[in-house]
Amino acid sequence: MKKLLIGLFLVSSVLAFSERVVKGDKAYADDKGIVYVEGEKTPYTGVIEGYNAQGKLEGKATYKDGKMDGSSKLYYPSGKLQSEAIFKDNVQNGVQKDYFEDGKVKLELPYKNGKPEGTAKEFYPNGKLFVEATYKNGIKDGYEKSYYDTGALQSEKTIKNGKIDGVSKIYYPNGKLGSEATFKADVQVGVQKDYYESGKLKAEVPYKNGKADGVAKAYDETGKVIEQVTFKNGQQVK
């Protein structure tokens, strides 16, 4: 008898704490963003599921007292997981993960108090890192790097308050420097230098306030000047 009573208690506990599930077309949000189910006056607690015209699940989210609280997931038409995120009191926190349809991670984006915060990573379908960037208070700040699908560095730049600030570099697949330029608050300044894959200088173009300004030179791989053009405020001077 004791075992039977324990079993009944466990079953009743599971039922008591099982989540309620309603379809999205039965729910609505008021002007404060609080979610209710049609015909009910109490803010909704449970899971809301959204379906497409074909009746396939598109997404679902967990709510508590009318606010997103817990996991939120989106799905591909195939039913495979596309994206997942965590919310607390309608505010996104933790790492959002997006997936390719084969299940491999496509994006990892950390959130804090509803804004991106920390190092975000985007991946190629083969699992190699594609882009890596740092965020502060919802804005890119720090650095951004991109990679070839082989894993070799493709580009790197410094970012301050959402704008490129400092030296920006682009690399060949073999790792050799292809180009370097300087920016100040997203505006290109100084001399941009382009290189042959051998490492020899290919071109020099001076910039001022985001526009070519001064004498630009192109070189062959022996170092000989093969072209020289003068610019003023972005326009070629003839």
Write out the residue ranges for each language-model feature.
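Sec-dependent N-terminal signal peptides
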Residues: 4-12
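Glycine/tyrosine- and acidic-biased, solvent-exposed loop/turn segments at the edges of beta-strands
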Residues: 14-238
